[in-house]
């Protein structure tokens, strides 16, 4: 911005800085089966000129790519979809200074069947983070084996895993020096968050039965723009979301406002599916643990950090999940072991026999919680089978 002001000042031109990405993006089905996209502009407290004047909406139909976008002046857009077709949407803010970064991609699909039930997919995976920080009295550095972090898209930022963490060896060089690593990762690419992780949830739910499926950002639910009570089933996907303690932003799975919304929802006989690598381990306070036990009937049984344990069995299906960092899809290096609390029961197990998923079939509400990200199921067919089985359980 300093360079912008300097150059424009030399030409006596006013400065306009591109806007921040929009917030509270959500898709809702209207009474006549149209899709209403809504969002809010993001205020830039550090730049008065970064105010959007228009918005670009990009749409992808089915397996096709995104179009060139269409411009609107308001903060909503109504779209008429074809039945049984999955549409993907993303929105950017625009002014004379340029175009903002896009929102996470959200998807929707309207069923051709009359009486189809409404399902909401909540995209709760917003985390961007560096690798796990090691910083105590004697050790310092980054532990890539514990958590490689979450990059935005593809990343080739690693030479090798840090081997030496001894703080007393700061300033030394070579093996044994603080920060020393080898080069086993040099030239390798690793995939991070692609901002479209919820799309497969929408597609798989739509393919599993007569459902009208729409998606929303988690902040739109937290801020009350989306009412969970409008939906027969709610699917919360968290990916690698967690409050890691060292990032500049808190990436909490179940925030206080989200917990309150879910507690209200299940009191009305709601049905909830939750998946993510840290859905239980991210809940450390007594109130947070109480929420897990009351809503999902689970307790934390520990964390499985052995990336060679990638096989899962349950619902009559054997499948594997992505545990090793790779260039195709983000990996769940650590997954949660979640133990059922009566009358809930274990629905899936990891290869070592620990509990991977828990189901609760109550008269008051139903819940299905998975200690790994649904989208990390490695085989598409297996993932679709799992989703269909879970939806059948929740919808009955």
Q: Which positions does each model-derived feature cover?
A:
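Hydrophobic/tyrosine-rich beta-strand signature of extracellular beta-sandwich/beta-rich modules
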Residues: 87-91
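A recurrent domain-boundary module in secreted/ectodomain proteins
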Residues: 1-19, 372-396
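Short, surface-exposed beta-strand/loop micro-motifs that present aromatic residues
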Residues: 107, 334-336, 345-366
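A glycine-rich, often tryptophan-bearing local segment used as a flexible ligand/cofactor-contacting loop or short
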Residues: 240-349, 386
């Amino acid at each position: 911005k300093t360079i912008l002001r300097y150059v424009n000042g030399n030409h006596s031109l006013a400065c306009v800085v591109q806007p921040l990405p929009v917030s509270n993006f959500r898709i809702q089905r209207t009474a006549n089966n149209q899709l209403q996209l809504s969002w809010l502009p993001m205020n830039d407290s550090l730049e008065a000129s970064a105010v959007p004047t228009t918005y670009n909406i990009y749409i992808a139909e089915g397996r096709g790519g995104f179009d060139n976008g269409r411009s609107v002046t308001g903060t909503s857009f109504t779209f008429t979809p074809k039945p049984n077709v999955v549409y993907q949407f993303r929105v950017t803010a625009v002014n004379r200074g340029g175009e903002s970064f896009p929102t996470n991609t959200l998807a929707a699909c309207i069923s051709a069947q009359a009486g189809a039930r409404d399902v909401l997919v909540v995209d709760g995976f917003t985390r961007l983070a560096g690798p796990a920080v090691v910083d105590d009295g004697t050790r310092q550095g980054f532990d890539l084996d514990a958590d490689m972090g979450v990059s935005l898209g593809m990343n080739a930022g690693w030479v090798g895993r840090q081997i030496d963490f001894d703080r007393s060896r700061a300033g030394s060089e070579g093996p044994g020096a603080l920060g020393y690593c080898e080069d086993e990762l040099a030239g390798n690419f690793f995939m991070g968050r692609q901002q479209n992780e919820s799309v497969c949830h929408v597609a798989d739910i739509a393919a599993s039965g007569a459902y009208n499926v729409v998606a929303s950002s988690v902040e739109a639910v937290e801020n009350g723009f989306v009412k969970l009570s409008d939906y027969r089933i709610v699917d919360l996907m968290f990916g690698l979301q967690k409050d890691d303690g060292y990032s500049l932003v808190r990436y909490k799975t179940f925030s206080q406002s989200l917990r309150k919304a879910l507690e209200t929802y299940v009191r009305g006989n709601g049905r909830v599916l939750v998946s993510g690598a840290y859905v239980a381990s991210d809940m450390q306070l007594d109130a947070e643990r109480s929420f897990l036990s009351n809503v999902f009937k689970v307790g934390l049984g520990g964390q499985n950090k052995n990336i060679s344990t990638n096989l899962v069995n349950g619902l009559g299906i054997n499948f594997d999940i992505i545990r090793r960092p790779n260039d195709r899809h983000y990996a769940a290096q650590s997954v949660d072991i979640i133990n059922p609390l009566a009358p809930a029961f274990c629905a899936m197990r990891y290869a070592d026999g620990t509990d991977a998923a828990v189901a609760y079939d109550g008269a008051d509400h139903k819940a299905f919680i998975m200690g790994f990200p649904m989208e990390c199921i490695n085989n598409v067919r297996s993932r679709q089978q799992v989703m269909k089985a879970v939806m059948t359980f929740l919808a009955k």
